[in-house]
Structure formats: C-alpha cells, structure tokens
UniProtKB/Swiss-Prot annotation:
Protein name according to UniProt: Interleukin-19
Source species of the chain: Homo sapiens
Entry annotated with the keyword Signal: yes
GO terms under cellular component: extracellular region; extracellular space
Domain of life: Eukaryota
Entry keyword annotation includes Ligase: no
Protein family: Belongs to the IL-10 family.
Gene of this entry: IL19
Pfam families with a match to the protein in the record: IL10
Length: 177
C-alpha cells in the first residue's frame, strides 16, 4: 500500500513538473559566448556613448519595459529584440572607425546566431508571443522612431549592455567555443 501511494505521489509530481510553464522550464537555450559579446561591447562602449547627443533619452527604458517581462514572454521578447538590433540598429548605424565596425559586426554575427537558435525553438513551439511581449517590443520600436535614425542607432548601440544583462538574467545560456 505504501509503495503504491509513493508511486502515485511520484507520478503526480512528475506530471505537475512537466506541465508547469514557469521561470526555469521550457525556456530556450541560447548557445553562444555571451562573455565574448560583452567584451566586444565594452571595448567600444565609451566611443559609441560619446556620440550620443541625447543622454537623457532611453530606447530600451530598462525599468519600464524589460523589467516587467514575464518568464513566459522572455523568448518572444528576446527574439524580437534580436531582430530589432539586426534589422534596424546595426543596419542604420554607419561607423567610420574600422575597429569599432569590426566589433559591431562581431556582435551582429553573434545576434544572427542567437536568432537561428530561437527560430529553432519557435519551430518546436517553445517560443510563444503573447500580447504583452508584442506591446513591450512595440514600445522599444516607438522610442527608436522618435529619434532621427542615426541618433536612434547610436542610442540603441550605447544601451546594448542593458539588453545583454537582461539576456544573461533571463535565459539559460550555454557557452559555445
């Protein structure tokens, strides 16, 4: 009788754990070297932020937009922000300094790789986009659109550390060599 109760309890626990969609479960694994991306950004951060002509304006608005993202929306928001940086920020930014351009290109390539990883996750139906996630991304695009394109690209590049810290906090990151 005790063995049967323990077996039923164990089975029930396993079923609950498998069906729960909480902070640690069913998140997409980002397989990339985040430390390398962060290092690349730190090497150019000062030069990028020195070009920022709107120091009191934010695009990512850390407290208002990214901090309120629910665990269920992390994959979608990450996917959307990677697309935002790849499709808008990196394309809109025109960098004359070859050293900075190489670092930005390296970061962009890493973002493309992360996009590929999240696309696979989405194909497995593990990356849902709820209205809250779409709204958060829209706020960031609206903030970007309020500035002139060049200024918005500089501002967004200067805030890249905010996005990288958010990825580290909200994703299981597996470092690849």
């Amino acid at each position: 009788m005790k063995l049967q109760c323990v077996s039923l309890w164990l089975l029930g626990t396993i079923l609950i754990l498998c069906s729960v969609d909480n902070h640690g479960l069913r998140r997409c694994l980002i397989s990339t070297d985040m430390h390398h991306i962060e290092e690349s950004f730190q090497e150019i951060k000062r030069a990028i932020q020195a070009k920022d002509t709107f120091p009191n304006v934010t695009i990512l608005s850390t407290l208002e937009t990214l901090q309120i993202i629910k665990p269920l929306d992390v994959c979608c928001v990450t996917k959307n922000l990677l697309a935002f940086y790849v499709d808008r920020v990196f394309k809109d930014h025109q960098e004359p300094n070859p050293k900075i351009l190489r670092k930005i290109s390296s970061i962009a390539n890493s973002f493309l790789y992360m996009q590929k990883t999240l696309r696979q996750c989405q194909e497995q139906r593990q990356c849902h986009c709820r209205q809250e996630a779409t709204n958060a991304t829209r706020v960031i695009h609206d903030n970007y659109d309020q500035l002139e394109v060049h200024a918005a690209a500089i501002k967004s590049l200067g805030e890249l550390d905010v996005f990288l810290a958010w990825i580290n906090k909200n994703h299981e990151v597996m470092f690849s060599a």
